[in-house]
Structures are given as C-alpha cells and as structure tokens.
C-alpha cells in the first residue's frame, strides 16, 4: 500500500453498490491509517462543483444521446483534474461511485451509442488512465427493479425499463470479461452480511 490507488464501484441502479461503499471506505481507511494516507470518496457524475451541476442536468433532463455522453465526459475531465489526479499524486486512495465503465454500460450498452465513439472520448479525456480496481455489483435487472421501487423518486436512469438494464448489465459483464485483472465481481443478490464477506476478500487482496 505504498502508493495511491483508484478504486471504482459499478453496477446497475438498484444493485446496492452505494449502500456498501461507505462501509468499504471505512474499512479501507483503517488499513491506510498507519501509513498516514487518506481515502477520498467521490462519485460520478459529480465530485466537483461543476460536476454536481452537470449531474443534476444529466439525471433529470431529457437530451440527445451524444449530448449526454459528451456531458458525462466533460464532468469526468473536471473530476480527474480537480479531485482524482491530485489525490493520487499525494499518495491518497480514491474510491469513486461510478467512472468510465458506467458510461460504456449506460450510454453504450443501455442507450446503444457506438462503442468507438465512447472510446474516442475516453482516449481524449483520460488517455490510458484506468482504475486499479473496479468492484462490480452484479444483479439481475428484475431484482434491481424491485429494490428501486421502494426507494425515493427515481431519476431518468432509474426509471428505465428492465430491458435497458439488461443491456447495461451485459455491457458491464462484457467489460469485466475483457479486463479480469481489474474487475472483482460481487454477487449482489446476496444478503448484506454475505456481500460484506465478499468485500472483505477484496480488501484483503489490496
């Protein structure tokens, strides 16, 4: 644990990743405390003043598909420049609720935006930069839908159909298959204690 690392939490809406993120970060901070390092917790879209304004627009206003993708990457560039890159340069660890995998899954898999367009934006905004670890909370869309149904008023993504989330999930799993060294897949259908046991194994490997 000598240098800063970048960890992302991913999954379709209703997978439960955000529920477990704070717990994971508290445990990670306990491991890092002796080395004098901090855990920076952030999210996408968001994480900066501009990013949070874009988040409000992206989650609630209908827009052209390509406009949506461009705004996602604009928020990401600001996030990298102001939060992620400075924290890693200090030697701190960053844990983000979503990153670029979400854009490929939602705008690519879910909405059908061609992958080559997203790859072009990815190269422009972040070069070859990728998370050191991506924790993917995997759950069937029907299960996630039941969980979302009991939550607050849904945003425009949470209101999407099971078919949309099936495509989104498939893209997440495709990316995990292409980069098994980077992904840790969590069975998010399990109970909270069982999921935390899975996360303990992830923490132990860091």
Curated annotation (Swiss-Prot):
Gene that produces this protein: tmk
InterPro entries: P-loop_NTPase, Thymidylate_kin-like_dom, Thymidylate_kinase
Residues annotated for ATP binding in this entry: 11-18
Catalysed conversion reaction: dTMP + ATP = dTDP + ADP
Keyword ATP-binding: yes
Protein name: Thymidylate kinase
GO molecular function terms attached to this record: ATP binding; dTMP kinase activity
Family indicated by similarity: Belongs to the thymidylate kinase family.
Keyword ATP-binding carried by entry: yes
One GO cellular component term noted in the UniProt record for this chain: cytosol
């Amino acid at each position: 644990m000598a240098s800063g690392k970048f960890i992302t939490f991913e999954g379709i809406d209703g997978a439960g990743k955000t529920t477990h993120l704070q717990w994971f970060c508290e445990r990670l901070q306990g491991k890092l405390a002796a080395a004098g390092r901090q855990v920076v917790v952030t999210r996408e879209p968001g994480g900066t003043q501009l990013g949070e304004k874009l988040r409000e627009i992206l989650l609630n206003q209908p827009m052209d598909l390509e406009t949506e993708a461009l705004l996602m990457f604009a928020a990401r560039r600001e996030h990298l420049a102001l939060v992620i890159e400075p924290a890693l340069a200090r030697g701190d660890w960053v844990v983000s609720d979503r990153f670029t995998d979400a854009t490929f899954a939602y705008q690519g898999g879910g909405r059908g935006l061609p992958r080559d367009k997203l790859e072009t934006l990815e190269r422009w905004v972040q070069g070859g930069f990728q998370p050191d670890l991506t924790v993917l909370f995997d759950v069937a869309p029907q299960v996630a839908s039941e969980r979302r149904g009991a939550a607050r008023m849904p945003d425009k993504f949470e209101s999407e159909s099971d078919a949309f989330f099936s495509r989104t999930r498939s893209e997440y799993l495709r990316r995990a298959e292409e980069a098994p060294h980077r992904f840790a897949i969590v069975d998010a259908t399990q109970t909270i204690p069982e999921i935390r046991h899975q996360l303990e194994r992830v923490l132990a490997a860091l």
